[in-house]
């Protein structure tokens, strides 16, 4: 079974089934949180649900990117809205970690030639990343969970002195790393695997005046208004105090003044 976003969700749940003739049928089993529905798929062909979706589906872009199936730009989205280092055997995230979209194979090779070391994480970016804060006090916001895996070698590197600054690519990477550092310190039995990797659901909400244990610099795009990611970025701008909020507003004002591109296909900033 799969957790899916359905449109229209409630009406589909009442009907119980949907599908495409000679391709697949699907049963809607129950509703979950954040607009998710648990669905069991029955492909007509002998193929996996992932292969079925690759063959019939289109790239699930964020809701603020307006595309139709016949839009000529849609053909490029399959390549553009995916990092060059994505693991195709672990395709369950609802969105790309968009800070990584700026990297090309040539850029990665150039950075490695200059001495940079890379560690890959598995990030299952969740639909909650798009949910805005809708309360007056951020402490009342119900933060979303996102599953992640940090391989053993990467986690060992995080625990040792670094020869240079540790640069996280994207806010989801920061959240996962900081969650892992705290979780392995307080309850390692809940997340450490026998081979030394870390697997868990990040459930921490990072906002000023939070500090950071294992990340020294951050590459991140420009985010949506009222996003929890803005809270994380403002904390990262000035760890341990509230000054990052004012700095973040100034940075975004400058970006608007100079016509920077925002959101998934937009520009990025490097915070050191």
Predicted segments, located by residue:
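Surface-exposed, charge/polar-rich loops and edge strands
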Residues: 1-272
